[in-house]
């Protein structure tokens, strides 16, 4: 049943680590809700910045937020004005000091979350779903992906009956735990209703048993700002 489970959750502790990295005893529920609130706020505020991941760490009663984005300039703003304002807002929400790191995604065409969001925005603009899917697959394969699969479901093209369409190229070995598979979803809100987009990108195999392996790859590609 490897096809049914979330590929990220299945690989936690093998070649992928958690997006919230902290330990709490009594305050666990409070901090968890705080994390959810911070993520929701950032994803809404930075919609135009192409945010893929938000990592939250809590060393010594502080919060360290790392934003993985395709457009760091949009997050930072002119002379760093926007990022300072953002840091202040996050500090108020978290009730303490928050440090912000911005990590640039050099190849957004290989990031599953960004691919899904791009296809969803095209569906909202009434671009033909097959063309949007095919274009995304071609871009990913051209930039070095070993395999990609895209699922689009809902009232595609305004059809009366909802259905699922998928497109795949290359290998996407969901059962292989050492496979570096990136998974992302997005929702397109069209006039006919919502359409769901799921994307799996296979980037190769990670042979070392290292939960931080995927993060190290990302950091090698783009130094943090």
From Swiss-Prot:
Record-linked InterPro entries: KH_dom, KH_dom-like_a/b, KH_dom_type_2, KH_sf_prok-type, Ribosomal_S3_C_sf, Ribosomal_uS3_bac-typ, Ribosomal_uS3_C, Ribosomal_uS3_CS
Gene3D superfamilies noted in UniProt: 3.30.300.20, Ribosomal protein S3, C-terminal domain
Keywords noted in UniProt: Ribonucleoprotein, Ribosomal protein, RNA-binding, rRNA-binding
Annotated ranges, domain KH type-2: 38-106
GO cellular component, one term: cytosolic small ribosomal subunit
PROSITE patterns cross-referenced by the UniProt entry: KH_TYPE_2 (PS50823), RIBOSOMAL_S3 (PS00548)
Keyword Oxidoreductase: no
Source organism superkingdom: Bacteria
Segments passing through the bilayer: none
GO process annotations (BP): translation
Function per UniProt: Binds the lower part of the 30S subunit head. Binds mRNA in the 70S ribosome, positioning it for translation.
Quaternary structure and partners: Part of the 30S ribosomal subunit. Forms a tight complex with proteins S10 and S14.
Family, similarity comment: Belongs to the universal ribosomal protein uS3 family.
Protein name, as recorded: Small ribosomal subunit protein uS3
Species, as recorded: Rhodospirillum centenum (strain ATCC 51521 / SW)
Source taxonomy: Bacteria, Pseudomonadati, Pseudomonadota, Alphaproteobacteria, Rhodospirillales
């Amino acid at each position: 049943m490897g096809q049914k489970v979330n590929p990220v959750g299945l690989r936690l502790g093998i070649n992928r680590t958690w997006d919230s990295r902290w330990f709490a005893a009594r305050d666990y529920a409070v901090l968890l809700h705080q994390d959810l609130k911070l993520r929701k706020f950032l994803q809404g505020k930075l919609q135009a910045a192409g945010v893929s991941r938000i990592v939250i760490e809590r060393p010594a009663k502080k919060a360290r937020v790392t934003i993985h984005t395709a457009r760091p300039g949009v997050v930072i703003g002119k002379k760093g004005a926007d990022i300072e304002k953002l840091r202040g807002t996050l500090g108020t929400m978290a009730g303490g000091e928050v440090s912000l790191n911005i990590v640039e995604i050099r190849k957004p065409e290989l990031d599953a979350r960004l691919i899904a969001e791009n296809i969803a925005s095209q569906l909202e603009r009434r671009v033909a779903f097959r063309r949007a899917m095919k274009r995304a697959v071609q871009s990913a394969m051209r930039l070095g992906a070993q395999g990609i699969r895209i699922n689009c479901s809902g009232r595609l093209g305004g059809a009366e009956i909802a259905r699922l369409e998928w497109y795949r190229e290359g290998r996407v070995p969901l059962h292989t735990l050492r496979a570096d598979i990136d998974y992302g979803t997005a929702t397109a809100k069209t006039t006919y209703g919502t359409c769901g987009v799921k994307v799996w990108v296979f980037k190769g195999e990670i042979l070392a048993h290292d939960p931080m392996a995927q993060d190290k790859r990302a950091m090698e590609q783009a130094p943090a700002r």
